């Protein structure tokens, strides 16, 4: 069965964005030639799940980087699909359960926080690869909401980089 893998960056104090969906803090760890394992990770997935706000932010910056994969943009407002990119307004749990049963590579959850926390409520995230950025933001969008079930994890690995980024990899205990 395919796995849902959350691959995301967060500040030391648990925020994935500053107020107004500002992701500028990510530039703290930008280093030429360093992708923090992203290319290796992205080769293991063929499907991407992300929220509409995250999608809109990405396409304002660059061309959608996942156009070659099956992408499901979770939205409350139906929009026309664009190639392999589907704007999905149905039940998220049903979609994930359907995708997990299909043949293919893993499923990349790219955020945002609403999608992550909805998936956590139903124990639908199998692995967590979280890159911790060395900054305390103080406010913004929290990665994990307070009102969610406890989720026990098994340690897979931890990597540290000279930029100060630490990448943590865990699997959900079954």
What are these regions (language model features)?
Residues 1-174:
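Enzymes that bind and transform nitrogen-containing heteroaromatic metabolites
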